[in-house]
A protein has these predicted regions:
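Non-catalytic accessory segments flanking enzymatic or RNA/DNA-binding domains
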Residues: 1-129
Length: 129
């Protein structure tokens, strides 16, 4: 499917929306990447607790891949763009912030939606353009 766009990103109250402003797809320039937060949701869009925090060069392709192999809906809770090396380090920072919820690999488990949103806000505080 060419031209697939990400669904709108959910924002917690007070989260700086500037990095996401008018984001509709990937940055095609070489040397750039994304850190993302995807949440597994019920068919009604309610987060089920499982959250994937990772790095990719193509956030739209990664979203489609995760959605394809996952039987539940996937919602984007956050994505940050930057230079590849910086974003790879930022992914480690994001994993450290969420370490108390670590399940395995890049997957984390949260007990409620507000814990997901709080973690996204904490990750956002460490994002430097």
């Amino acid at each position: 499917m060419r031209g697939t766009k990400l669904p709108p990103t959910l924002f917690a109250e007070g989260v700086d929306k500037t990095p996401w402003k008018r984001f509709t797809g990937d940055d095609k320039r070489k040397g750039y990447g994304f850190v993302y937060v995807f949440a597994e949701c019920s068919k009604h869009g309610i987060p089920m607790g499982n959250v994937k925090i990772g790095y990719t060069n193509s956030v739209t392709k990664r979203y489609k891949d995760v959605q394809h192999y996952n039987g539940n809906r996937i919602k984007v809770y956050g994505h940050w763009r930057g230079e590849e090396d910086t974003m790879k380090m930022f992914e480690s920072t994001a994993h450290s912030i969420a370490r108390d919820f670590h399940k395995h690999g890049e997957w984390f488990h949260f007990s409620n939606t507000s814990a997901i949103i709080d973690t996204v806000e904490d990750i956002n505080k460490h994002y430097e353009v």
